[in-house]
């Protein structure tokens, strides 16, 4: 299984707020609309977004998101950092684009899962 810590290390991500870095990451959800994340994300997913305001932390807590990943070198707002520290939500950031990170994470997550049995 893939952890937040392993992803941060392998991709050279800057960890801005250290929540539980041992959390499992089972998938990835990419969206900048909070309502979309609320409706469609799943427990233990990594959320990739451009959003930097404190509401992303609230959504991450409600949805059981393993960590937040901010792209394009975006820094979280000071209030977001404070809220994430209080809620123990990991926030990471990268200078990479959302597209680049999506591709890298897809490969990492796919490679970490056991092979599925095909037809006999």
Q: Where in the sequence are the language-model features?
A:
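Short, structural beta-strand-to-alpha-helix junction motif
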Residues: 2-4, 97
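Intrinsically disordered, low-complexity boundary segments flanking structured domains
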Residues: 1-2, 15
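Short secondary-structure junctions
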Residues: 12-18
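Feature captures the catalytic cores and cofactor-binding loops of soluble hydro-lyases/lyases
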Residues: 22, 31-46, 50-120
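Structured beta-strand/loop patches that form or line metal/cofactor-binding pockets in enzymes
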Residues: 26-28
């Amino acid at each position: 299984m893939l952890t937040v810590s392993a992803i941060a290390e392998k991709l050279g991500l800057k960890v801005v707020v250290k929540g539980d870095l041992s959390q499992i990451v089972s998938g990835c959800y990419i969206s900048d609309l909070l309502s979309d994340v609320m409706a469609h994300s799943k427990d233990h997913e990594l959320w990739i977004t451009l959003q930097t305001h404190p509401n992303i932390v609230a959504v991450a807590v409600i949805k059981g998101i393993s960590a937040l990943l901010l792209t394009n070198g975006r820094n979280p707002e000071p209030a977001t950092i404070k809220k994430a520290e209080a809620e123990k939500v990991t926030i990471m950031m990268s200078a990479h684009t959302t597209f680049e990170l999506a591709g890298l994470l897809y490969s990492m997550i796919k490679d970490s899962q056991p092979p599925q049995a095909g037809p006999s």
